[in-house]
UniProtKB/Swiss-Prot annotation:
The lineage of its organism: Eukaryota, Metazoa, Chordata, Craniata, Vertebrata. Expressed in tooth particularly in odontoblast, ameloblast and cementoblast. Also expressed in bone particularly in osteoblast. Disruption phenotype: Mice display rickets and osteomalacia with isolated renal phosphate wasting associated with elevated FGF23 levels and normocalciuria. GO terms for cellular component: cytoplasm; extracellular matrix; extracellular region; nucleus. The keyword Kinase does not apply. This is Dentin matrix acidic phosphoprotein 1. It comes from Mus musculus.
Length: 503
């Protein structure tokens, strides 16, 4: 890659130097310099940086000034293909396009490369250079101003274009343009060098106080001074960029480290929050399950109480009803107390406690309270079974008393036994269908039975025939319901298998 760049550079020089010979009258000095350049090619590092610095102002010279030479165009086109910072030819346009791309990207390499104008000026600057020490100091000051302005060119691209036009004015007389342009640019840059002109062989430059009559020695001194100043500037610019880059890298590392810490903390906090949510959800599910079991057991106890009440109302006489009701009322507050204890357990389990120790303590309390509630449930169930046994014994006593009364009444006793049996069968069949209907029908049956008892005690044999018709009709109705339920099955489901018939 470097060899290709050197070949392109030599080809551009070979095309540019004959044009410079025709425009300049100092043929001797220019021929000697071309011989030196053809004999020894410039070093690659300084020459490449100075090549790119020369390419951008000459590329703008093509758009701003119409009287630029072919050498400037060819150099601007050839140098626009190479960037030492990138290593590959990223832009194939002119120098102005490359400068705009680098200004947009915010790269500082272009400003550093523009500072190295010295080596090329010292080697083949042409006869129109400023040869006195005063002019050299003025040009160094102007070049320093241009470097400072070029460093600020990233923020203001319009200012960078103006200063690049001034740099182009410095490079145009060095490349060997027309004598009038070189005179105007030298007067603007040199700071009042009136006696300078590009005519003659260098003897007219003595008016400005040259130290020697030899133009070659003064030019070489100027070239060395500019090379040293350019090297110092490049080192300073590199020194300025290096600490800023290191500081930026340190700041970025610290920001990344802090962001990682905050990210880890957020992860830890999220995991803790998820753990708390899972604990709270598990406790809520446990409390809900306990509530569901409590509600189921309460519903069971209520259904058992209802059945006990219905049986006691159907079979027991009026004198023994208050005793069974009092026993059932005594069983209800125990169940209410158990439900209240369960509600307290659920409220305790649902309380959000952030500490793990308090959570563990609450869980243990909730487990112990659940065990207590289960014990209370078992005790309530045993009480309900005892109440059922008491009610059954009361029913048996009532049946025995009724049998004694029936023995005294004669036929009425047998009729009352049939009524009690029919009422019990009807209540059982109807309870299996629906609880609400069973309650209403049991109440009506109990009222009918009490009325029939009163009528049997008062009327005697006249009412016995009517009471015989009623239980027979009710038994027939219950049998019809059972038969209808059996015959209303679909035809395909007569067998107990789940499969359809025929397969």
């Amino acid at each position: 890659m470097k060899t290709v760049i050197l070949l392109v550079f030599l080809w551009g020089l070979s095309c540019a130097l004959p044009v410079a010979r025709y425009h300049n009258t100092e043929s001797e000095s220019s021929e000697e310099r071309t011989g030196d350049l053809a004999g020894s090619p410039p070093p690659p590092t300084n020459s490449e940086s100075s090549e790119e610095s020369q390419a951008s102002p000459e590329g703008q010279a093509n758009s701003d000034h119409t009287d630029s030479s072919e050498s400037g165009e060819e150099l601007g086109y050839d140098r626009g293909q190479y960037r030492p910072a990138g290593g590959l030819s990223k832009s194939t346009g002119t120098g102005a396009d490359k400068e705009d791309d680098e200004d947009d990207s915010g790269d500082d390499t272009f400003g550093d490369e523009d500072n190295d104008l010295g080596p090329e000026e010292g080697q083949w600057g042409g006869p129109s250079k400023l040869d006195s020490d005063e002019d050299s100091t003025d040009t160094t000051q102007s070049s320093e101003d241009s470097t400072s302005q070029e460093n600020s060119a990233q923020d203001t691209p319009s200012d960078s274009k103006d200063h690049d036009s001034e740099d182009e004015a410095d490079s145009r007389p060095e490349a060997g343009d027309s004598t009038q342009d070189s005179e105007s640019e030298e007067q603007r840059v040199g700071g009042g060098s009136e006696g300078e002109s590009s005519h003659g062989d260098g003897s007219e430059f003595d008016d400005e106080g040259m130290q020697s009559d030899d133009p070659e020695s003064t030019r070489s001194d100027r070239g060395h001074a500019r090379m040293s100043s350019a090297g110092i500037r490049s080192e300073e610019s590199k020194g300025d960029h290096e600490p800023t880059s290191t500081q930026d890298s340190d700041d970025s590392q610290s920001v990344e480290f802090s962001s990682r810490k905050s990210f880890r903390r957020s992860h830890v906090s999220e995991e803790d929050y998820r753990g708390e949510l899972t604990d709270s959800n598990s406790r809520e599910t446990q409390s809900d399950s306990t509530e569901d079991t409590a509600s189921k057991e309460e519903s069971r106890s209520e259904s058992q109480e209802d059945t006990a009440e219905s049986q006691s109302q159907e079979d027991s006489p009026e004198g023994q009803d208050p005793s069974s009701e009092s026993s059932e009322e005594a069983g209800e507050p125990s169940q209410e107390s158990s439900s209240e204890s369960q509600e307290g357990v659920t409220s305790e389990s649902r309380g959000d406690n952030p500490d793990n120790t308090s959570q563990a303590g609450d869980q243990e309390d909730s487990e112990s309270s659940e065990e207590d509630s289960l014990n209370t449930f078992s005790s309530s169930e045993s009480q309900s079974t005892e109440e059922q046994a008491d009610s059954e014994s009361n029913e048996s006593l009532s049946l025995s008393e009724e049998s004694q009364e029936s023995a005294q009444d004669g036929d009425s006793s047998s009729q009352e036994g049939l009524q009690s049996q029919s009422a019990s069968t009807e209540s059982r069949s109807q309870e299996s269908q629906s609880e609400q209907d069973s309650r209403s029908e049991e109440d009506s049956d109990s009222q009918d039975s009490s009325r029939s008892k009163e009528e049997s005690n008062s009327t005697g044999s006249a009412s016995s025939s009517e009471e015989d018709i009623r239980p027979k009709n009710m038994e027939a109705d219950s049998r019809k319901l059972i038969v209808d339920a059996y015959h209303n099955k679909p035809i395909g489901d007569q067998d107990d298998n789940d499969c359809q018939d025929g397969y």
